[in-house]
């Protein structure tokens, strides 16, 4: 029997009972009957459920920690179905909230892997748009810790969105949500079936005046309008009681104004103009992502297989101020277009060799073509009589740098789930990965997890994972740096080594205890040893991050969690202590000042996204009030503060921003009356109830761009009708 530690949200305070730590069921596979297509809705439900169980048995999370939110849990939180994925995941244990919609799991920068029904969807070009809409999911899970061998590449966490299954009733819903900062968010879903074919579609639109975090503490940002569109479609055809084919895909389009920070000081003269109001800048960025997956699944007795070809196209465009205002402040501007086209295939399988051994295996291949085109305007420079560098003319020069790269990722894994006893499971294996792009590297990565359940409700786990994380392909070639010598875009550092893959030793252990009356508590501890630690920073006007490496690094942390679910009440809470440090920047050195390189070359420093303490809590109560159900919800988020410049000006990232606590409140009335009231839901939410003014970033630190403040208090309301 397989017992797996799936740790959920801790101290669960207002998400429903399904947002909790769970234990993965044993990976036994049902023996199918005659291979023929089901001929009734009931047969479809049973077959789909069994195929889902078989798919989950292919990709279990043995020995890792998993935070799971069901559809009910996603709906029963402040914001409900209209909450974005970042806000949902920020409530998970050990997750740090950052600017630009980013989160850091266990103090790692990005390094998150997104999957739909277990199939990897390649990451989009780094920006701040949200590719996935939680409303498409029947459940959302975050997997962390020492991952089994089937999980490679991005390994700080795996976010898996599982779509609904079974025979879809014909119906759907339509809703509208809006409020402060001119928020308008209509959405709709449609689902149904015809014969053995099920379909589901979702669409949403979001407009508000807080597309990117406000660089000032004011209630409303200047020049911060966003328009975002998301579409998703899913079709599944059950071919027989042992096989099905599923096709799904989506589109995310985001248009963002870059918010302005008034009162900035001009430093250059453009065409005789040396003054410009920084509140009037007009910089914009658009992000487009399209993805699709076709998955064939076979579940026949002891053998389960899934093969899934996929594609993803992502594009980011940045447009500077058309009047050249940013040139007057910075001495240059960039108009950029970055694109990435990915085709690949993922195949996974499991075979139950004996009662004690389940063998899992798989391959992965991805081909990516990236293109970059950056047109820069800048001033030529000269020196004055005192030897100071000054602009030689107020007329700009132009240079376009275009590059392209085709790269590949290869992966293969094999592992064995060995049931040593009914209470003790040992999962061990290895994977081989190779990258052929800006860097040519490969690694064999052993993985091992031991899970022990000495008694009902008690689970211990300990694990080790060797990880290999290739850098993203949107890299800057060193040749571009030299082309800007003698201009206002000249870099102080004239060289940059290529970005390398990160290599990591990961150790993790923990225990989970299920107590009486629905209370579960757990603790998890980890330690990581890193070579070529990957980090990313914002080094230009565009809000696209660029990667670089520290030669060495390490991270450690401890997570405490608890949740309570009993009847109508669900509560959770988490607290985590952790940190990450790196030493000696060994790639993309042209992004940094010489004094930074000198200090970091001889000292460990905190990475800019390292936060000592994080915490979250929340809960919900379901009240049957005669009209249906009344569901008040609340949650809070605590951050100890991300890194900033050293107040003494000595240690990079040697300072820290002030800590903060924000709380959100919501209440929803779900009607269950006759006629139009059937399926009707209305809700009201308050974000940042105390109107806490807090900085996520202050604009200082290694690779940090402009200041960013958290959202001020906002009031929102919504209505949704299910049909």
Question: What is the role of each PLM region?
Answer:
Residues 42-79, 110-113:
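N-terminal periplasmic "start-of-domain" segments of outer-membrane beta-barrel proteins
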Residues 77-80, 86-121, 138:
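Extracytoplasmic beta-strand/coil segments of soluble accessory domains associated
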Residues 85-88, 103, 127-128, 142, ...:
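N-terminal periplasmic accessory domains that precede
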Residues 119-145, 233:
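Short acidic/polar hinge/loop motifs at secondary-structure boundaries
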Residues 178-207, 218-259, 284-304, 353-354, ...:
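Transmembrane beta-barrel wall of Gram-negative outer-membrane proteins
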Residues 295-318, 453, 460, 497-549, ...:
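Membrane-embedded beta-barrel scaffold of Gram-negative outer-membrane proteins
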Residues 419-421, 521, 525-529, 548-645, ...:
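Gram-negative outer-membrane beta-barrel transporters
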Residues 637-645, 669-723:
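C-terminal beta-signal and adjacent terminal beta-strands/loops
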């Amino acid at each position: 029997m397989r017992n797996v530690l799936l740790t959920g949200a801790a101290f669960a305070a207002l998400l429903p009972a399904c947002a909790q730590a769970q234990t993965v069921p044993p990976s036994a596979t049902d023996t199918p009957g005659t291979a023929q297509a089901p001929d009734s809705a009931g047969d479809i439900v049973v077959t789909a459920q069994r195929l889902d169980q078989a798919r989950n048995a292919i990709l279990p999370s043995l020995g890792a920690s998993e935070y799971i939110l069901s559809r009910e849990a996603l709906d029963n939180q402040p914001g409900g179905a209209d909450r974005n994925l970042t806000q949902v995941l920020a409530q998970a244990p050990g997750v740090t909230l950052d600017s630009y919609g980013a989160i850091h799991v266990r103090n790692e920068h990005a390094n998150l892997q997104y999957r739909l029904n277990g199939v990897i969807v390649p990451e989009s070009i780094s920006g701040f748009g949200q590719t996935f809409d939680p409303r498409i999911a029947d459940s959302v899970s975050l997997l962390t810790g020492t991952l089994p061998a089937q999980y490679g590449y991005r390994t700080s966490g795996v976010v898996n969105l599982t779509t609904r299954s079974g025979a879809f009733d014909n119906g759907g819903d339509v809703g509208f949500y809006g409020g402060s900062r001119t928020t308008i968010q209509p959405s709709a879903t449609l689902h149904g079936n015809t014969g053995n074919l099920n379909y589901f579609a979702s669409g949403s639109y979001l407009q508000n005046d807080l597309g990117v975090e406000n660089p000032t503490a004011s209630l409303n940002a200047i020049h911060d309008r966003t328009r975002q569109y998301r579409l998703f479609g899913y079709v599944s055809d059950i071919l027989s009681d042992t096989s099905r084919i599923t096709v799904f895909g989506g589109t995310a389009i985001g248009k963002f104004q870059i918010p302005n920070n008034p009162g900035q000081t001009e430093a250059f003269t453009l065409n005789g103009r040396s003054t410009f109001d920084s509140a009037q800048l007009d910089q914009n960025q658009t992000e487009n992502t399209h993805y699709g997956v076709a998955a064939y699944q076979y579940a026949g007795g002891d053998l389960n297989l899934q093969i899934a070809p996929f594609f993803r196209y992502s594009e980011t465009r940045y447009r500077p101020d058309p009047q050249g205002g940013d040139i007057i402040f910075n001495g240059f501007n960039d108009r950029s277009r970055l694109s990435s086209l990915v085709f690949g295939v993922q195949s996974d399988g499991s075979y139950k060799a004996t009662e004690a051994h389940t063998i899992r295996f798989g391959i992965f291949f991805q081909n990516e073509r990236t293109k970059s085109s950056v047109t820069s305007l800048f001033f030529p420079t000269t020196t004055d009589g005192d030897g100071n560098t000054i602009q030689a003319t107020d007329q700009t020069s132009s240079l376009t740098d275009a590059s392209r790269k085709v790269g590949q990722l290869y992966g293969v894994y094999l592992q064995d789930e060995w049931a040593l006893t009914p209470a003790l499971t040992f999962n061990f294996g290895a994977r081989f990965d190779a990258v052929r792009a800006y860097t040519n590297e490969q690694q064999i990565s052993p993985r091992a997890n031991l899970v022990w359940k000495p008694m009902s409700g008690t689970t211990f786990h300990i694990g080790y994972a060797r990880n290999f994380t290739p850098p993203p392909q949107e890299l800057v070639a060193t040749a571009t740096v030299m082309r800007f010598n003698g201009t206002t875009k000249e870099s102080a550092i004239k060289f940059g080594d290529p970005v390398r893959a990160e290599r990591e030793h990961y150790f993790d252990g923990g225990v989970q205890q299920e107590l009486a009356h629905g209370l579960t508590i757990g603790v998890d501890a980890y330690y990581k040893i890193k070579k070529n630690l990957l980090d990313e920073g914002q080094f230009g006007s565009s809000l696209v991050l660029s990667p670089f490496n520290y030669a060495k690094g390490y991270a450690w942390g401890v997570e405490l969690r608890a949740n309570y679910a009993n009847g109508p009440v669900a509560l959770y809470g988490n607290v985590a202590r952790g940190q990450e440090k790196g030493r000696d920047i060994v790639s993309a050195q042209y992004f940094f000042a010489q004094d930074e390189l000198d200090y970091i070359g001889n000292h460990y420093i905190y990475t800019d996204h390292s936060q000592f303490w994080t915490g979250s809590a929340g809960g919900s109560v379901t009240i049957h009030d005669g009209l249906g159900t009344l569901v008040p919800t609340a949650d809070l988020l605590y951050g100890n503060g991300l890194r900033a410049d050293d107040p003494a000006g000595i240690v990079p990232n040697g300072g820290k921003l002030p800590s903060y606590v924000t709380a959100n409140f919501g209440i929803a009335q779900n009607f269950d009356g006759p006629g139009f009231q059937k399926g009707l839901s209305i809700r009201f939410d308050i974000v940042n109830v105390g109107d806490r003014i807090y900085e996520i970033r202050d604009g200082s630190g290694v690779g940090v761009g402009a200041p960013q403040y958290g959202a001020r208090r906002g009031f929102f309301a919504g209505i949704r009708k299910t049909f």
